[in-house]
């Protein structure tokens, strides 16, 4: 038996494969194939567009897949959300679908767009957004390059953004947030009733979450006399309580902890000033909480 897993093809593909590698699973792809292999003989992968992932997972064509919550909501299909994975194509953060208009337009809020044309890939969510506000608009599906459509081809757009740089580059101004979205590991409801598949999905979630948690963090080891331990611990903003282990010399202990990588620059000199020795900073692959 194998777990059939969907990998998002397109903008999320590179970031997803890199995340899998950090989690310990290498995904081998080919430019001429929509299938992929992994180092785990019990997992077979298909490259599927994120927009279609929920469809194939809900049908059982795939047991699980990675996609955005936006596309799950847009599809309206029943799948099980297993894990929220805090990464996107450019960063460790989530994304937003926003309502944007030309910088020099008079529109300041959604209600100002009554009777206007809205271009978007997220048609169903956008329809519900305007319907909830009682604003009649004409929503047109956009096949991409949505940012270039106002003002000639559309009066406004609903588009996804991470940093807002693409919108600014196209002289667009955000007037509202339609919905936030995050990357999700989703699964077929029936597949999660199968012991083998459920365990594979849960283990996959555990390892991916661990790889994400390790990003931007480093491990720190040091030795310190018991008499200086309190001062050394006061320097450490630990993820949890630091691990303290006795050394052969009963007057000394070893301290092991996790810190933000950017904090190491200031913390290590302060530890040295607190009489810590043998300070070692090391990279992390996974942090399983």
Curated annotation (Swiss-Prot):
Feedback inhibited by histidine. GO terms for biological process: L-histidine biosynthetic process. Pathway: Amino-acid biosynthesis; L-histidine biosynthesis; L-histidine from 5-phospho-alpha-D-ribose 1-diphosphate: step 1/9. Keywords: Amino-acid biosynthesis, ATP-binding, Cytoplasm, Glycosyltransferase, Histidine biosynthesis, Magnesium, Metal-binding, Nucleotide-binding, Transferase. It holds the Pfam family HisG_C. It is an enzyme of class 2 (transferase). This is ATP phosphoribosyltransferase. GO terms for molecular function: ATP binding; ATP phosphoribosyltransferase activity; magnesium ion binding. Belongs to the ATP phosphoribosyltransferase family. Long subfamily. It catalyses: 1-(5-phospho-beta-D-ribosyl)-ATP + diphosphate = 5-phospho-alpha-D-ribose 1-diphosphate + ATP. InterPro entries: ATP-PRT_HisG_long, ATP_PRibTrfase_cat, ATP_PRibTrfase_HisG, HisG_C, N-reg_PII-like_a/b, N-reg_PII/ATP_PRibTrfase_C. Catalyzes the condensation of ATP and 5-phosphoribose 1-diphosphate to form N'-(5'-phosphoribosyl)-ATP (PR-ATP). Has a crucial role in the pathway because the rate of histidine biosynthesis seems to be controlled primarily by regulation of HisG enzymatic activity. Its EC number is 2.4.2.17. Signal peptide: none annotated. GO terms for cellular component: cytoplasm. Its cofactor is Mg(2+). It is found in: Cytoplasm.
């Amino acid at each position: 038996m194998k777990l059939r897993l969907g990998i998002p093809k397109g903008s999320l593909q590179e970031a997803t494969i890199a995340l899998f590698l950090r989690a310990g699973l290498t995904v081998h792809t080919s430019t001429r194939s929509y299938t992929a292999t992994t180092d785990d003989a019990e997992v077979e992968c298909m490259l599927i567009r994120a927009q279609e992932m929920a469809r194939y997972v809900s049908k059982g064509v795939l047991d699980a897949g990675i996609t955005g919550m936006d596309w799950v909501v847009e599809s309206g299909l029943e799948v099980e959300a297993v894990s929220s994975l805090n990464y996107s194509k450019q960063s460790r953060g989530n994304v937003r679908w926003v309502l944007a208009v030309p910088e020099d337009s008079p529109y300041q809020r959604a209600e100002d767009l009554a009777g206007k044309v809205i271009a978007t890939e997220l048609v169903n969510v956008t329809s519900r957004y305007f319907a909830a506000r009682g604003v009649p608009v004409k929503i047109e599906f956009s096949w991409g390059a949505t940012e270039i459509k106002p003002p000639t081809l559309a009066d406004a757009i609903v588009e996804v953004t991470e940093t807002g740089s693409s919108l600014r580059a196209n002289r667009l101004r955000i007037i509202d947030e339609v919905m936030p979205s995050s990357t999700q590991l989703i699964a077929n409801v029936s597949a999660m009733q199968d012991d083998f598949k459920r365990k594979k999905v849960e283990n996959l979630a555990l390892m991916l979450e661990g790889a994400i948690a390790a990003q931007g963090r480093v491990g720190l080891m040091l030795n310190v006399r018991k008499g200086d331990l309190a001062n050394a611990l006061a320097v450490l903003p630990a993820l949890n309580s630091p691990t303290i282990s006795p050394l052969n010399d009963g007057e000394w202990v070893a301290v092991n902890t996790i810190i933000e990588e950017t904090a190491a620059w200031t913390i290590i000199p302060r530890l040295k000033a607190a009489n810590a020795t043998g300070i070692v900073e090391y990279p992390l692959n996974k942090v399983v909480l």
